[in-house]
Amino acid sequence: FNLAAETHVDRSIDNPEKFIESNIVGVFNLLECFKEYSKKSKSRLIHISTDEVYGDILSGRSNEKFPYKPSSPYAASKAASDHLVSSYVRTYKIPAIITNCSNNYGPKQHPEKLIPKLIYNILNNKPLPIYGKGKNSREWIYVKDHCEALLKIFLKGKIGEFYNIGSNKNLNNLQVSKELINISKKIFKVGKKIKILF
């Protein structure tokens, strides 16, 4: 399972080179090693990617037939790595599968990600930072559900295929913020008025 990647969109805008090194060159190095290893082993490579490769989905959900339209250096680096893996399947016949997952959330997630950042700010009675008007809609999946899907794909997936993984739970950033505030109020005392900053 290749879960290694630089993933923060804003950081990819500030320093795209790091994302190219990790997400493209790193995957190339992995593929070169796996190309030799797979000749002696019955292993398969599961390359974990993101639904960010599809760009902005204005309505509905993305599917495996959607064209790639990355809208950040992060998304572009993941799209490039997906194509690189796919090319190694076709050219060198390596046993690999590509997955594109929606936004994960769960325990021990990096604090710069949206849900942990919002929870931290709620707990510390700080304003909740929301980009634009908070209408950006994303699909969210609990990390354990993502892992279960990866295991199914590992066991039953078809070599060379792309599989989207999601939850069917689309929420915009404003909805996520309000939901977290409501849940927090049920569990413990939070500040009287938590501000949402746009």
Per-segment meaning from a language model:
Residues 116, 122-198:
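C-terminal substrate-binding subdomain of Rossmann-fold SDR/epimerase-dehydratase oxidoreductases
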Residues 107-111, 169:
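Residue-level signature of the cytosolic catalytic core of signaling kinases
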Residues 1-104, 124, 144, 173, ...:
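N-terminal Rossmann-like NAD(P)+-binding domain of SDR-like oxidoreductases, especially those catalyzing
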